[in-house]
Swiss-Prot record:
Active-site residues, as the UniProt record annotates them: H20
Catalytic activity, EC: 5.4.99.62
Pfam families: RbsD_FucU (PF05025)
Protein name per UniProt: D-ribose pyranase 2
Organism in which the protein naturally occurs: Rubrobacter xylanophilus (strain DSM 9941 / JCM 11954 / NBRC 16129 / PRD-1)
Top-level lineage group: Bacteria
Gene3D superfamilies (alphabetical): RbsD-like domain
Pathway assignment: Carbohydrate metabolism; D-ribose degradation; D-ribose 5-phosphate from beta-D-ribopyranose: step 1/2
TM spans (from-to): none
Length: 154
């Protein structure tokens, strides 16, 4: 038995399969998941599990290079928007029209994780990154400028 981390086997397997720039969508209970999408359905009841819990657990194991959200979220769900800004500080945010989140973003996802969240505009794209510090730790490798900020160097 695993001691810690995500215990759900399908979710753990999907996260382990991600490479650089792959897109994971973590969505609310009402998200129209495309028929052919690889999905993990965690929803049990309204807000069980909730979006913030699932995102927090994923964030402990997943390197997020970019967060994709609906541009309407800041206006119509400021608590969720603020929470995301806090928990994904230092990560690039891309804002897309809500309609694109339901269509283009959904069909671009390598996998979709459905929560029980009843959270307006609660559909979040996480673009997989790389561990910059580890990739460029070997002697003789040169850290490109565009990765310098991700590694926390000035």
């Amino acid at each position: 038995m695993k001691r810690s981390g995500i215990l759900n086997q399908p979710l753990s397997n999907i996260l382990a399969s991600f490479g650089h720039t792959d897109l994971l969508v973590v969505c609310d209970a009402g998200f129209p998941i495309p028929r052919d999408a690889q999905r993990v359905d965690l929803a049990i009841a309204p807000d069980l599990p909730d979006l913030r819990t699932v995102l927090s657990l994923i964030n402990e194991e997943f390197i997020t290079e970019k967060v994709v959200i609906a541009e309407e979220m800041a206006e119509f769900n400021p608590p969720l928007h603020g929470w995301l800004q806090k928990h994904f500080s230092g990560v690039e945010f891309e804002r897309r029209p809500h309609e694109e989140m339901l269509t283009q973003v959904a069909t671009s996802a390598k996998a979709i994780v459905r929560t029980g969240a009843f959270d307006p505009w609660g559909n979040i794209g996480l673009v997989s990154g790389v561990d910059v510090e580890r990739f460029f730790a070997k002697e003789g490798t040169v850290l490109p400028d565009y990765y310098r900020d991700r590694a926390g160097e000035a």
